[in-house]
Amino acid sequence: MANYQNASNRNSSNKLVAPGAQAAIDQMKFEIASEFGVNLGPDATARANGSVGGEITKRLVQLAEQNLGGKY
């Protein structure tokens, strides 16, 4: 698991806005992968990895909406 995380961090061009958020994002990624029965890594299919990424996005949007709580 750690090797995959390190490789993904090196290849990512996305910059996190909140310091320390990488650990939380990685934890969310592996929890969702576990829920979906996906083994993340270089041998996983793009469809399997994409399903995890899509679910991360969905959950992050839900969290943001809850935090905004009708402020906008």
Curated annotation (Swiss-Prot):
Task: Supply the alphabetized keyword list.
Answer: DNA-binding, Sporulation
The annotated site for Cleavage falls at E31, I32
Q: Give the GO biological process terms.
A: DNA topological change; sporulation resulting in formation of a cellular spore
A single GO molecular function term of this UniProt record? double-stranded DNA binding
- Cross-referenced InterPro entries, in alphabetical order? SASP_alpha/beta-type (IPR001448), SASP_alpha/beta-type_CS (IPR018126), SASP_DNA-binding (IPR050847), SASP_sf_alpha/beta (IPR038300)
PROSITE patterns per UniProt:
SASP_1, SASP_2
Matches recorded under Pfam families: SASP (PF00269)
* PANTHER family linked: SMALL, ACID-SOLUBLE SPORE PROTEIN A
Q: Which family does it belong to?
A: Belongs to the alpha/beta-type SASP family.
Function according to Swiss-Prot or TrEMBL: SASP are bound to spore DNA. They are double-stranded DNA-binding proteins that cause DNA to change to an a-like conformation. They protect the DNA backbone from chemical and enzymatic cleavage and are thus involved in dormant spore's high resistance to UV light.
Also noted in the record is: SASP are degraded in the first minutes of spore germination and provide amino acids for both new protein synthesis and metabolism.
Name the UniProt record assigns to this protein: Small, acid-soluble spore protein C
**What is the species listed in this Swiss-Prot or TrEMBL entry?**
Priestia megaterium (Bacillus megaterium)
Q: Which gene encodes it?
A: sasP-C
